[in-house]
Regions:
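Short, conserved phosphate-binding/catalytic loop or strand-edge motifs used
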Residues: 132
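Active-site-adjacent loop/helix surface patches within enzyme catalytic domains
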Residues: 1-129
Length: 132
């Protein structure tokens, strides 16, 4: 895992205890790499846009993990669940058959690693949500 924390990461509120892990997919230009996503977030934040998505981790198209925000800080990725949710954004696989293959093999491997790490840190079992 690469670590490249956002410049304002230390100013985010502390998270008491994560109890939810959620994966989202970025879409649009500039979401292929963590470096591009980080640059966009930094520019937005500096410009006063504090509503921009601030994930804990980003998975590039081929799967390398980059931590943008420590897991003990509150991110902005899950609306009312932000205070207790670890948010992970995955790069959009432009041109791929998203319905049939939403993630690359590298992304799937990184997602599995994150799930195991989350379960080890929190003690929660790895379960797929069946209802909201």
């Amino acid at each position: 895992m690469n670590v490249s924390h956002l410049s304002f990461a230390g100013t985010r509120p502390r998270m008491a205890a994560p109890r939810l892990l959620i994966f989202h997919s970025h879409s649009g230009p500039g979401t292929e790499t963590a470096a591009k996503v980080k640059s966009y977030i930094e520019r937005s934040w500096a410009g006063g846009d504090h509503g921009v998505t601030v994930p804990h981790e980003h998975l590039d198209v081929e799967g390398p993990r980059t931590q943008l925000l420590p897991w003990d800080r509150v991110g902005i990725s899950s609306y009312r669940a932000n205070p207790f949710c670890i948010g992970v954004e995955t790069a959009d696989r432009k041109g791929a058959n998203i319905e049939a293959e939403p993630w690359s093999e590298g992304q799937l491997q990184a997602m599995a690693e994150i799930c195991v790490e989350f379960a080890q840190r929190t003690g929660y079992p790895i379960e797929r949500a069946t209802a909201w």
